[in-house]
């Protein structure tokens, strides 16, 4: 399997993209991850576009021992494996890992990333160090423009 730095490396610009689900209440990274803020805590996952580009998800690899660690923005916190490739998961903002969605480590449940990327397939829950850091992320319109 090829390991890639981010999901954007999978894009074939010669293909016409289908309409992707891009909820307006989320913020997005250039690495095709989303973050949903709830107070000072936030849920993080990969976008509908990312799961579509990756194909069938087989495993979400986030060590549960990471809970309690504080990571910087763009620091790797895990990986996601698909039939096509493996991709790194990067922190969208700095924060403390509060919870890992361990259900996704099961191959059957990992498929939730394909069917429900913004719901049951959240990957980690974090305590955001600085909520203002989200201002540097993409809103839904900017993310939609990015993926074309």
Question: Which stretches of residues belong to each language-model region?
Answer:
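Generic structural signal for buried aliphatic residues
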Residues: 71, 77-78, 97-98
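Short coil-to-beta-strand transition motifs
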Residues: 25-29, 87-94
């Amino acid at each position: 399997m090829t390991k890639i730095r981010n999901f954007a490396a999978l894009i074939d610009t010669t293909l016409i993209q289908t309409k992707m689900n891009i909820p307006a209440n989320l913020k997005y990274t250039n690495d095709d991850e989303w973050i949903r803020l709830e107070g000072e805590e936030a849920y993080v996952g990969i976008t509908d576009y990312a799961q579509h580009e990756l194909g069938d998800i087989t495993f979400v690899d986030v060590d549960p021992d990471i809970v309690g660690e504080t990571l910087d923005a763009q620091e790797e916190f895990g990986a996601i494996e698909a039939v096509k490739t493996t991709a790194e998961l990067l922190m969208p903002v700095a924060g403390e890992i509060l919870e890992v969605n361990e259900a996704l480590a099961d191959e059957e449940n990992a498929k939730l990333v394909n069917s429900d990327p913004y719901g049951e397939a959240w990957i980690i829950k974090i305590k955001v160090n600085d909520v203002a850091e989200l201002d540097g992320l993409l809103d839904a319109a900017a993310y939609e423009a990015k993926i074309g």
